[in-house]
Amino acid sequence: MRILFTPAGDTDPVRGYHDGAILHILRHYPADKVILFLTKDMEEKEAAMQCYTRGIASVAPDVTVEILRSGITEPQKYEKLTAMQDAFASAYDAHPEAEWLLNVSSGTPQIKTVMALLALDYPRTKAIQVPSPERKSNRGNHPCRTADELIEMLNCNE
């Protein structure tokens, strides 16, 4: 079994009509399950538009998605991210046979750092870093803001 453990960020699921990191990883590293770790802001985005689950379903319709709602309101503070470490440790222990993919490209810089450290600390993990389509910052491309915009970007995704 291959499991993608991933935070979500504003570039997910799509930005500027291109895959965000989560979708890119699923296209190139098919997984059986996705464990989606959400901070409070991303929980609200998912609740409003189902953007992450819709995006995942658009590229991997048969994958199982488990959503972990952390309630974290300050993801820029390392001390708030122990919940992510604990969630991964629990999932890792629950699936001792799994191959793990870790998305180190989504979320705040602090979340990305924690994800990279998890990849170093646990065997059977592979850290996956996804560059932006422009190979530089995504500042010029706005993230999805409405469900209609999400559907348009998913349908026209390059």
Where are these regions (language model features)?
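Long, low-complexity, Lys/Arg-enriched
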Residues: 1-101, 109-158
